């Protein structure tokens, strides 16, 4: 049956998890990667080794499968008393529950909570039997191999899944970009700019393999833009400068401008560019907030970070150029030609156009300097292309959906039989799905 049912695609991020089935255009569920458990006095259990001591699957569903030391053998009512996602956030607002985020900076930190989260995702939300489905999970670049082994132990021993494939998020984001009209060939070589809520990563990928030594992270992402909008509202003394209002303004009105000085002049000449945003406060009272310069100033912190903070001063285009220049020389042309955007903080209007222009200027300046030093030898130039597409927000999930529906996907998965024969270390390596020898 597992050969006929669609694969389950799960992209668990620091902020949000995306769950769904291969072949679909969008995830079935998107909710916070959060879990609410009973306070310690209520006895939530857990093991010091990091392996969970929780029950999730009724014995009549296990068919006797699975060792006695895992979920199916530890059915206590206290182990089932928890919530995930939006329900967890709501439960934590009441008495008796504590809110936890099992993933920090892309890495799973609490395996007990993560197993409970996966269990509810599978049985309560997706409502599938793991024995009948192959699973495609995502991981951040440079994820420790021990994390893969822990994941395999949970999915094979606790959930008894039919097959497991773990893919790097950046590689899946490249696959998601294949839907763009700009992409002529389905290449897994490119530079992925993944900007979510907490951090922005610049990740070079060559033939489906991450160039780990060249990865750079910058401490500017969606949350910083929200804080910046909030500070601008407070400075003006707006009647509502809450974080929620700042986020609404960021998502609804902000865009990237080609030149910040000229944009200020445009606003000063044309007052119609200033907008009004109406908020209904908890008591039912409506207030109006003026929306002005922050429309273009907020996303500008990617390109001129000094307007936000003195802690980090390197513009994103300079970081991207440096990442590619630090990569092996034989793949640099492909990395410049296929710069792929991923994550919610890359969705601003004209973000890709501005990034492409600024990187191109850096490249052209370097080429001209090289031509001068060489005594007049002319360069053939370098193609710089930033790829924007409709699947940017959930790029890794959609890439997993694309690759998970291919006929050969199941042959690339590791199975329960292989896991039992070779042990957890088998998941340290996966054949490259969609790359050389793949689709």
From Swiss-Prot:
Segments for region (Disordered): 40-71
Annotated localization: Cytoplasm, Cytoskeleton
Record keywords, A-Z: Actin-binding, ATP-binding, Cytoplasm, Cytoskeleton, Nucleotide-binding
GO cellular component: actin cortical patch; Arp2/3 protein complex; cell cortex of cell tip; cell division site
One annotated GO molecular function: actin filament binding
GO BP term, pick one: Arp2/3 complex-mediated actin nucleation
Signal peptide as annotated in the record: none
Biological role: Functions as ATP-binding component of the Arp2/3 complex which is involved in regulation of actin polymerization and together with an activating nucleation-promoting factor (NPF) mediates the formation of branched actin networks. Seems to contact the pointed end of the daughter actin filament.
Similarity comment: family membership: Belongs to the actin family. ARP3 subfamily.
Assembly notes: Component of the Arp2/3 complex composed.
Protein name in the entry: Actin-related protein 3
UniProt lineage: Eukaryota, Fungi, Dikarya, Ascomycota, Pezizomycotina
Gene that this sequence comes from: arp-3
């Amino acid at each position: 049956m597992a050969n006929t049912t669609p694969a389950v695609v799960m992209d668990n991020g620091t902020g949000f998890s995306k769950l769904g089935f291969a072949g679909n255009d969008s995830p079935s569920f998107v909710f916070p990667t959060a879990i609410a458990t009973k306070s310690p006095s209520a006895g939530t259990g857990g093991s010091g080794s990091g392996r969970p001591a929780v029950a999730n699957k009724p014995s009549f569903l296990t068919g006797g499968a699975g060792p006695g030391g895992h979920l199916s053998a530890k059915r206590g009512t206290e182990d089932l008393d928890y919530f995930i996602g939006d329900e967890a956030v709501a439960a934590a607002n009441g008495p008796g529950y504590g809110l936890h985020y099992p993933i920090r900076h892309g890495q799973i930190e609490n395996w007990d909570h993560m197993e409970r989260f996966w269990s509810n995702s599978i049985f309560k939300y997706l409502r599938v039997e793991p024995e009948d489905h192959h699973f495609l999970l995502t991981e951040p670049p440079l994820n420790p191999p021990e994390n893969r082994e822990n994941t395999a132990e949970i999915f094979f021993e606790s959930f008894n899944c039919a097959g497991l494939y773990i893919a790097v998020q950046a590689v899946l984001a490249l696959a998601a970009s294949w839907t763009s009209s700009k992409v002529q060939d389905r290449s897994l070589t490119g530079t992925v700019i993944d900007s979510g809520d907490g951090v922005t990563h610049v990740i070079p990928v060559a033939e489906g393999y991450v160039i780990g030594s060249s990865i750079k992270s910058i401490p500017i992402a969606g949350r910083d833009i929200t804080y910046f909008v909030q500070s601008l509202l407070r400075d003006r003394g707006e009647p509502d400068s809450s974080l929620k209002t700042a986020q609404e303004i960021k998502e609804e009105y902000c865009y990237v401008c080609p030149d910040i000085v000229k944009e200020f002049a445009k606003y000063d000449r044309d007052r119609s560019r200033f907008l009004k945003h109406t908020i209904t406060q908890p008591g039912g009272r409506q207030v109006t907030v003026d929306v002005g310069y922050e429309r273009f100033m907020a996303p500008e912190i990617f390109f001129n970070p000094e307007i936000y903070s003195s802690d980090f001063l390197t513009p994103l285009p300079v970081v991207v150029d440096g990442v590619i220049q630090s990569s092996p020389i034989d793949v640099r042309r492909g990395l410049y030609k296929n710069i792929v955007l991923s994550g919610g903080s890359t969705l601003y209007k004209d973000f890709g156009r501005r990034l492409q222009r600024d990187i191109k200027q850096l490249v052209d300046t370097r080429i001209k300097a090289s031509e001068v030093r060489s005594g007049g030898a002319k360069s053939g130039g370098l193609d710089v292309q930033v790829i924007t597409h409709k699947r940017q927000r959930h790029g890794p999930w959609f890439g997993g959906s694309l690759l998970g529906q291919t006929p050969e996907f199941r042959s690339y998965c590791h199975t329960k039989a292989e896991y039992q024969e070779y042990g957890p270390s088998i998941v340290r390596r996966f054949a490259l799905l969609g790359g050389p020898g793949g689709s």
